[in-house]
Curated annotation (Swiss-Prot):
NCBIfam families: PRK11187.1 (NF008389). One of its GO terms (cellular component) is cytoplasm. Homodimer. Polymerizes to form helical filaments. GO terms for biological process: negative regulation of DNA-templated DNA replication initiation; regulation of DNA-templated transcription. It comes from Enterobacter sp. (strain 638). This is Negative modulator of initiation of replication. The lineage of its organism: Bacteria, Pseudomonadati, Pseudomonadota, Gammaproteobacteria, Enterobacterales. The gene is seqA.
Length: 180
């Protein structure tokens, strides 16, 4: 994997062509340029380009200002629409929120627990210790585990708390919770 330096305007343009959460900059550029690795051999751009000039690291495309757009794209995605169970939609939303801002997600989940239950933990065992019937599942693409034997209303409440903590607009929170 190589890194390249791009200005903010170009980065925003590339980011605006994101089709799904977690899509890499390489995937976006390949699609935009209609380029596939199998169709053309890699050729150096110039012999004068030196590795020391390559400064910026390639980032996953999810800038803070596009987090609302990213959540809306999740709701419109085929992957989300194909989920028949509320628990699967719940896990997809959690994965997306984590990918947008893992620090804010961590802060939100630390303050989220019931009177007698812990909802999120770093390992399955912690959740099982707080209730034998919790049915913990790992949130895909994250280090978090979440209990899943709660009713849909509780799952919505958990997502609402996290999204409010991450400062999403109220109408988007309502829309997301309505789809779970």
């Amino acid at each position: 994997m190589k890194t390249i330096e791009v200005d903010d305007e170009l980065y925003a343009y590339i980011a605006s062509h994101t089709r799904h959460i977690g899509e890499s900059a390489s995937d976006i550029l390949r699609r935009m340029l209609k380029f596939s690795a199998a169709s053309q051999p890699a050729t150096p751009v110039s012999k004068e380009v030196r590795a020391s000039n390559v400064v910026a690291e390639a980032k996953t495309v999810a800038p803070v200002k596009d987090k609302v757009r990213a959540v809306r794209e999740l709701l419109l995605s085929d992957e989300y629409a194909e989920q028949k169970k509320a628990v699967n939609r719940f896990l997809l939303v959690l994965t997306t929120l984590y990918s947008l801002d893992n620090k804010a997600f961590a802060e939100a989940t630390e303050s989220l627990h019931g009177r007698t239950r812990v909802y999120f933990a770093a390992d399955e065992q912690t959740l099982i210790q707080n209730g034998n019937q919790t049915k913990p599942k790992q949130v895909p693409g994250t280090p978090y585990w979440v209990i899943t034997n709660t009713n849909t209303g509780r799952k919505r409440s958990m997502v609402e708390h996290i999204m409010q903590s991450m400062q999403f607009p109220a109408e988007l929170i309502e829309k997301v919770c309505g789809t779970i």
